Each structure stands twice: as C-alpha cells, then as structure tokens.
C-alpha cells in the first residue's frame, strides 16, 4: 500500500469497489510540516473551493473529488509548482493536511486530474457558477464592474502565438491577453483569454458585457429603480482609455449599461474655476476630498468629468 498507508480497511474496500471515497478525518498532530497552509482552509471554503462539486465526477476510489481539490489548492499555497514535485514531499505529513493517512502517488494524481480535464466544458461552467456566487456576495445597490486587460507572455514553443506589446519590458513578445472583470476593491470575478487579441473595445462588445448580462441578476429593488428612472443603468462598467469608443458607449447605453472611462484624446486643461471640491466615498467607506468638474458632450451626451490633483 505504500509508506504511511494506515487506513488499510478503507483502502481494501476502495480496491474492491465498495467505497466511493475515503472520508476526511482531521486529527490532532504535532510538528506537522507545512501545517500553516491549513490557516487558509476557511478562506478557501468560503470562496467556494468545494462548491458546485456536482459539476464534476470521479470513479469510486480511495481519493475522492474533495481530497483532490483540497490537495491541488494546498499545493498552490505551499508553492509546489507541479505534480511531479510531490515526489519529494513527505506523503504522510501531507496526508495529515488532507485528513487522510497519505496523499496519492503522483501517477494516481495524474490519472485523477486527467479524468477531470476530459470533462469538456465543466471548468467553464464551474467558473461561471463561482463568479455568480462572488458577484451576488459583493453586489451593491448599483452593480459596478472594473474591466482590465493583462498581457501574459508565452515562453513555450508549442504554438506560434501573435506578438503583443509588453509594457513592463517595452518589447513585442509572443503572448496572450487576459481580460478580467473585477470588483471595485480589486477582487477578481472571472476572465476571458484571447490568444488573438482584437483590443479591449472588441472584448467589451463581444465577450465581457454579454457574459455579465447573461449571468448578473437584477435585484427586484434595482429593477424598480430602473423602471422609475430611465437614467438608472443596469450596471456600470469602468475601464481605461484603451476601451474609449463613443460608438461602443452608445451601444452599451442602449442596453442600459453605463460607462466610466478616460478620454483617449484629451485637449487643453479645463479652467481651474470650473472645479469644485466634493467629498467622494471610496469602496471601504473612506471619504476623500477631490476637486471635480463636469461637462456634457453632444455625441449621445455622455457626461465628461475632470479631476484636479488633491
């Protein structure tokens, strides 16, 4: 059975097909290597690590879906970069972290992961369900989402990806672009990967806002506000000047989606006398004093706001 395999009856039952999965049973221990990662376990569970497990399935065996998910999550926290590196870890010590006698052998773990990866489309469904759960937990009276793109450099040789400009290195390199939707405090909800990038405007029009429209529920109270006031948006999108497009803004507003964006082609500075000091409440309730000004524009009359330094 291997080193540290002490739950022999359950292992025999699993080998005979009589056990769906071994139950997780944490017990007291001293001087367990890597035990500090368990401090993050409540946070992982609160974020939904084991939620929506019905979307996946594993054949009966000693190591069930819960054990595999926990092991992969704790590996990330312990900075173990690959399954192969588990060969050099104490299997019994890691078993204590999972509430088992030992962790699976690397070959067994690979087989389990391959079974999960062969279930096409399940990862996207799981991601969608988790994102909806996080959005519901963070949703304010008027939902606001921050969209941003990040270039991810590709260092492999398997695919000849197109080149993108990498700002931090000031070079064009083979890369893909991830477009993230975040909460206002920076917590991520979901992302869409674009191997061939057509820009933030196209991503907003074709991918990000359609996903939000399909998966972000409108509360009854917010629906009442929208019915009573045609200027109340369904939700608001915030993004940088890469997404500046008056045509896109007009298309989004036709679907009751508001936009907060930097002007891509600013001209001369606005006169200082147009600015007035206002108190602005930040995400965590902290108030700051800003000097703000506002102008209207004739193209669909989006409001244009300016801010001076404070």
Model-derived features: where do they sit?
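Dynamic "connector" segments at or just before major functional cores
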Residues: 1-171, 176-198, 202-229
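Structural preference for beta-strand elements that scaffold enzyme active sites
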Residues: 144, 234-236, 258
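Anionic group-transfer/hydrolysis microenvironments
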Residues: 150, 184, 242, 263-264
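Short, solvent-exposed polar/charged micro-motifs at secondary-structure junctions
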Residues: 154-157, 247, 271-272
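Acidic/histidine-rich, metal-coordinating catalytic segments
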Residues: 227-229, 233-243
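Acidic, metal-coordinating catalytic cores used for nucleic-acid/nucleotide bond scission
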Residues: 238-246, 265-268
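An anionic, glycine-rich sequence signature occurring as long contiguous blocks
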Residues: 250, 255-310
């Amino acid at each position: 059975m291997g080193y540290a395999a002490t739950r022999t009856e359950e292992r025999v039952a699993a080998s005979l097909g009589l056990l769906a999965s071994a139950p997780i049973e944490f017990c007291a221990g001293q001087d367990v290597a890597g035990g500090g990662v368990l401090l993050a376990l409540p946070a992982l569970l609160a974020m939904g690590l084991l939620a929506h497990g019905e979307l996946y399935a594993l054949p009966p065996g000693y190591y069930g879906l819960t054990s595999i998910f926990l092991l992969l999550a704790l590996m990330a926290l312990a900075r173990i970069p690959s399954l192969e590196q588990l060969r050099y870890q104490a299997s019994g010590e890691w078993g204590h972290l999972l509430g088992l006698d030992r962790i699976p052998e690397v070959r067994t773990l690979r087989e389990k992961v391959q079974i999960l990866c062969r279930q096409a489309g399940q990862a996207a469904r799981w991601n969608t369900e988790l994102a909806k759960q996080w959005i519901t937990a963070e949703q304010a009276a008027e939902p606001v989402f921050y969209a941003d793109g990040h270039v991810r450099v590709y260092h492999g040789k398997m695919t000849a990806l197109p080149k993108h400009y990498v700002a931090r290195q000031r070079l064009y390199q083979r890369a893909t672009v991830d477009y993230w939707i975040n909460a206002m405090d920076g917590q991520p909800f979901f992302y869409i990967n674009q191997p061939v990038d057509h820009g933030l405007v196209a991503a907003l029009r074709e991918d990000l806002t359609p996903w939000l429209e399909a998966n972000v529920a409108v509360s009854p109270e917010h629906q009442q506000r929208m019915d009573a006031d045609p200027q109340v948006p369904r939700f608001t999108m915030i993004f940088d000047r890469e997404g500046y497009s008056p045509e896109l803004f007009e298309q989004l507003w036709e679907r009751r989606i508001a936009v907060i964006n930097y002007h891509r082609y600013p001209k001369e500075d606005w006169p200082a006398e147009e600015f007035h000091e206002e108190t602005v409440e930040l995400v965590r309730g902290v108030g700051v004093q800003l000097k703000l000004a506002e102008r209207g524009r004739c193209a669909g009359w989006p409001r244009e706001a300016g801010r001076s330094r404070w």
